[in-house]
């Protein structure tokens, strides 16, 4: 059992024995010992600082392709979709996006601003945080090809900004400083890029033709 947490120190919502089936695309999974919905980045830092250092921490975006056992998750699950769900245009083709932003939402935003290549994000079923963690990609594009910088958080609640040179990035793999998690990133794109919402819709429709997006699904499965 997770050691007692001082609820008065945090502003977000702390749920106990939360069924993970409510938070995954597969609609299966036992209870998380604790699930925390932080109010914002500062509150997230306070939560981590007050959390016992022996308590495992897991991060949750939209729960795409996340399989949780019936026995649930021991430790703290942190759901970031709301607290880290902002997108901000910075100018000169740069866009900041929080780790909780759905990749499809990010794709549409960038295309509306005439920025690219960004339409490939529409083919990624998760959030920006997950895309950063594994260098997710689709339709020939990869997340880290567009990264200018990332904001990260450590277990002590400290926020830092890092650049791509501080990471080893490969196909569906990202290795960087230990004990840090992605809060979001600044992405760089070409302005007045030749793309359209129709292309984004076409990519989404291509996914729909291959996968039952409206039903609990594990997406594509490959046998090597």
Give the residues covered by each predicted segment.
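Anion-binding (especially nucleotide phosphate/pyrophosphate-binding) glycine-rich loop
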Residues: 2-128
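Structural signature of FAD isoalloxazine-binding scaffolds in flavoprotein oxidoreductases
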Residues: 29, 37-41, 67-85, 133-163, ...
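A gly/ser-rich beta-alpha-beta helix-loop segment of oxidoreductase catalytic cores
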Residues: 107-113, 117-148, 217, 223
């Amino acid at each position: 059992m997770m050691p007692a947490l001082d609820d008065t120190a945090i502003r977000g919502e702390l749920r106990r024995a939360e069924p993970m089936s409510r938070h995954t695309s597969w609609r299966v999974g036992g209870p998380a010992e604790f699930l925390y919905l932080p109010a914002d980045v500062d509150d997230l830092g306070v939560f981590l600082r007050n959390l016992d250092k022996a308590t495992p921490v897991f991060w949750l975006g939209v729960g795409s392709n996340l399989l949780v056992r019936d026995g649930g998750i021991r430790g703290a699950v942190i759901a970031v979709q709301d607290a880290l769900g902002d997108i901000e245009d910075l100018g000169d083709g740069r866009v900041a996006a929080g780790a909780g932003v759905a990749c499809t939402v990010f794709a549409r935003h960038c295309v509306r601003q005439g920025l690219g290549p960004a339409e490939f994000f529409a083919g990624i079923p998760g959030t920006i945080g997950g895309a950063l963690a594994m260098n997710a990609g689709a339709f020939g594009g990869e997340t880290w090809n567009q990264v200018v910088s990332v904001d990260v958080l450590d277990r002590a609640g400290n926020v830092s900004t890092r650049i791509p040179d501080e990471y080893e990035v490969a196909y569906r793999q990202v290795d960087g400083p230990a004990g840090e998690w992605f809060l979001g990133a600044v992405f760089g794109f070409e302005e007045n890029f030749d793309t359209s919402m129709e292309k984004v819709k076409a990519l989404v429709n291509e996914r729909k033709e291959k996968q039952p997006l409206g039903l609990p699904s594990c997406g594509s499965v490959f046998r090597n």
